[in-house]
């Protein structure tokens, strides 16, 4: 098994607040529990994880060994534009964390009720192969969520209002060093707002 794959899985479990024991890791990676236990022990011997009461946590060495990508959005109606963007973001690193906008954020930004609840949107995104962890964002402040995740790369969708320079400056103010990438899309016409208007 590739160390980066295991480290990315352990990182994602940590971000989601899940216990990263051998059973949970085995289920996530499709291993037998004893294989997962061996993976964890090997990573501990290499100084990449520490085992605390049977649960693995990445050390700074382990965290530096993987590239974490962060992307955020409303993701109300998952369409091909979203899937393309998520897939492109995933290719930038070893682990992809997707931050899902709160229902209250959707109400403020779009002036209407969310089409799908925040919990259902997290569950839906979690089911995508490219997504290592889907989490709820913090209302009104992307930087609180960024400080929790501590990504190496922030991937912005082609139509997101955040500006690359602004994100980089604000992150730096908070002690984060990260790269900001604006993703393109061959499907700029596919948008949730447009789909809703056509219904």
Model-predicted segments: where are they?
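Nucleotidyltransferase catalytic core that binds NTPs
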Residues: 1-199
